[in-house]
Amino acid sequence: MLSNLLKSIFGSRNDRLIKQYLKIVRTINELEAAISPLSDEELRAKTSEFKQRVANGEKLDQLLPEAFAVVREAGKRVLGMRHFDVQLIGGMVLHEGKIAEMRTGEGKTLMATLPTYLNALSGKGVHIVTVNDYLAKRDAEWMGQIYRFLGLTVGVVLSQMPHEEKQAAYAADITYGTNNEYGFDYLRDNMVGHSAERVQRVLNFAIVDEVDSILIDEARTPLIISGMAEGDTEIYKRIDTLIPGLTRQEDEKSPGDYSVDEKTQQVLLSEEGFEHAEKLLSEAGLLSAGSSLYDPMNVSLIHHLNAALRARALYNRDQHYVVQNGEVIIVDEFTGRLMPGRRWSEGLHQAVEAKENVPIQKENQTLASITFQNYFRMYEKLAGMTGTADTEAFEFQQIYGLETVVIPTHRPMTREDRMDQVFRTPQEKYQAIIADIKDCYERKQPVLVGTTSIENNELLAALLTKEKLPHQVLNAKQHAREADIIAQAGQPKMVTIATNMAGRGTDIVLGGNPEQEINRIRADETLDEAAKSKKIEEIHQAWQARHDEVIKLGGLHIIGTERHESRRIDNQLRGRAGRQGDPGSSRFYLSLEDPLLRIFSSDRVANIMTRLKMPEGEAIEHPWVTRAIENAQRKVEARNFDIRKQLLEYDDVANDQRKVIYQQRNELLDAEQGVSETISAIRESVVHQLIDRYIPEQSIEEQWDIPGLEKALASEFHLQIPLQKWLEEDSELHEENLHDRIIELVDTSYLNKVEQVGAPIMHQYERMIMLHSIDTHWREHLAALDHLRQGIHLRGYAQQNPKQEYKREAFELFTSMLDAIKADVTKILMTVQIRSEQQVESVAETSALRNLEYHHDTHSELAEEQPPVAENRENKQQPFVRKNEKVGRNDPCPCGSGKKYKQCHGKLN
């Protein structure tokens, strides 16, 4: 109450920020009179002037009014589009590293040109992040006209792009690309064998379009690069045939072998289920007589059994995936698009393939991984824009340190958002939806119907066909026609049924979009200019008539067939109507059997319906119901936030270790004088550790195991050292000088090898072996971390803190990995016999990674929503190195041990 009173007196923080920005807007508007008379050359010359001023030490903030005025003028000349004052405000918000919430149709794409141009003047590069390749390419071509006119270079990063083109795109002043591609390029840059193969520069400034989709919806799904693992795929088919023999528990009291938890997307075997499963596995010859599923050697069987149960109980065809050309293709739950080449991990995809009786592909091994949360936090400055961020403002602030600023609309919003109608059954709900669509169709009002799955999408399409109502269907199966369908969704009498993919990034223009028709006329070589102008004018007049007609009818009508888990996604659907002050309306139709209500709120709403004595077939439309639904959504949003926060806390451990490994790797790649000094330090450390194993510190000679040490030196380093003879001949030989003599002999042996082979060849080989060893052990370490994380929650039963235990054990694993790398490198270099340079090149070829797959995967114990996916691409890995976060020798080690870097993981240097 007090906060509301203070707001009414002083205004909210958002209001105060807008007032501050408006002062700068006035300055920009005053500059327009001086900028407008400039010639094109003079306007372009402003870029060189600004760059020089930045080089001389002037801050970007000081340049902002002039730079924005120049971009506004360029927009007028090149695109015929002048930035509104609200777009100038949005540009300032983005430049300050905040999130700009701007309503649909208010011009976010044009707004982004302002801070992009300003920050590109520093010469460090700006990354514009979009949700798909189509938008990246479209915006680079469209808005790129402004940047090129002003003398800046523009690049676009696409998924199948050749290596050289990708390097050129990242070298440009401004780069467009998708969130996935930026992340995968970063990982690939840290897997290359030569520094020249990297593609990314320093991560300077990123503007994330649809920031809620990328930083919230996809935050639970890490980017993973993997390769094929060995293994027999036949087991998936054999296990799948056993699943129908297990019965599902309908509730806690009823008998059954397994239960399904829809909230956490998990399948749990009961004790009876374990016994029944063991019997079925024994009969199938998969479990040896007398052994149990609990035996260590049968852990993989539990893994396969769980994957098969999840595939049968939780994953449905045409909802979570489709089957095309003998392949299981995942459907993106956020966009409704098909994701060819992507795969669920942990054997789930193979289990679904077995269920659908299509060819089964092998499982994958993780080679590199990072979450969007940790990738985007590496940028020196991060900003975002979307139409719906305010509901997630707390999370943006907590996780990314990003403040959300709501930008005022250019024109007042006139869309009418009607109250939800709730029915008892889906049948009643769909009858009401059909009646609403029919009413709009008869009045010629365009309708966009939003569905949450392909299954519901096609069900509604079938009902409309039965009613003989013409309509367009937009889902993952028709994604090729997406632009055409969305472009015409605002036509009179047009009925469009769409999944979540409903054209984010594409405006629905009332009366239809005439641009396609106009472009066709312009490309027609049989018409002269006069004829083209006449036809284009006729098209404009026809569009204006349709536009006016649709406005009179009330604009675009939005129908939601069920509520999403997040209020934000509902708002995105509503936001398709009412752009730039246009009229429009929206309504959601729900039933008590919809997933959100069934899982979270059905009892409460059913009680309300009973209390109000609602007859069957009647809808309830009441503030109580709306409140109950919003509470259910808040519950889900809070749960999802906790999951994302928990994922980040666990991933931060791996992230600190990742930084150390990638820094070591990049120092190896960039070392101009070779890595001989590093190799020498590692060799000395390994030899000391080996000697300490047989001659413990502060021990007496009787405790020494000299024969064991002689044998170890022979097997590890191929060195025959007569230690026993030394001791017999020299009574003065003690522990310390024995260490020194052994190390001296090891060094001499190695230097002799370098002389025989030649220093240049040996230095090249040293670098390759170091990189190969780091990469191999890092992959194994990632698998170990994943295995550790899967079972760490069980520590809670032993009164231990799982997160603390995870940090402690992950650190121990990391230390062991570093020791293993050192031992591995030393042993190989001491024992290898190099006869030619071709041998070295063959090692490089063997080390090159091929047939990589690119995943978007959830960690198993956190997989409470859409799980694991992977994308298969055939292009060579290519890639970035972040140098500006280099750890100083006396700084605390990033691994969290509390030691100085030079005394911990810096020893590798």
Curated annotation (Swiss-Prot):
Catalysis performed (reactions): ATP + H2O + cellular proteinSide 1 = ADP + phosphate + cellular proteinSide 2
SUPFAM superfamilies documented for this protein: Helical scaffold and wing domains of SecA (SSF81886), P-loop containing nucleoside triphosphate hydrolases (SSF52540), Pre-protein crosslinking domain of SecA (SSF81767)
GO cellular component, one term: cell envelope Sec protein transport complex
Ligand binding (ATP): Q87, G105, E106, G107, K108, T109, D507
Cofactor: Zn(2+)
GO molecular function: ATP binding; metal ion binding; protein-exporting ATPase activity
Cofactor note: May bind 1 zinc ion per subunit.
Protein's membrane topology: Peripheral membrane protein
Main location: membrane
Record family assignment: Belongs to the SecA family.
Protein name per its UniProtKB record: Protein translocase subunit SecA
Organism: Nitrosomonas europaea (strain ATCC 19718 / CIP 103999 / KCTC 2705 / NBRC 14298)
